[in-house]
Amino acid sequence: MDEKIVKFMRDNDKVAVWLNIKILEVRTGYSRISMIVREDMLNSVKICQGGAIFSFADFAFALASNSHGKIAVGISANINYLNPAFLGEELIAECFESGRSRKLGLYDVKVYKDENKKFVASFTGQVYIKEEKFEV
């Protein structure tokens, strides 16, 4: 993936900036990112808010789906949670392209805790692929 596109997406996605997401790897149809669970991400029972995990997975989805250079926008997404994440834990999200046609793409994101790869959540998403390319 063009490094200019990665930089553009990293710098201009305000939620990814707020989450302080680190981009570890991006290649065509794949991304791997990380973030540390902070206190302002916790819900009332002191576990990471599901919306923060969803947004984290969604950014991995955005990177992988836009890695071909054409603008791809999410049209459907779903997440299932298995284990909680706690304050100070590092989360890793890996996104894999499971299929892509001229206009649509399907992606799977796995979120886990880095220290032991304990599974946290599974996210699936679909994109609509526009004709427009990134101009950065």
Predicted regions located by residue number:
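Extreme N-terminal tail/first-helix region
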Residues: 1-17
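A generic structural signal for short beta-strands and their flanking turns/coil linkers
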Residues: 17-19, 29-31, 71-77, 89-91, ...
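Catalytic strand-loop segment that frames the active site of acyl-thioester-processing enzymes
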Residues: 18-48
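Hydrophobic residues in beta-strands and at strand termini
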Residues: 35-37, 81, 129
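Compact, glycine-rich, soluble single-domain proteins
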Residues: 43-62
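Hydrophobic beta-strand-centered segment that forms part of the acyl-chain substrate-binding groove
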Residues: 62-91, 97
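HotDog/MaoC-like acyl-thioester-processing domains
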Residues: 85-87, 92, 98-136
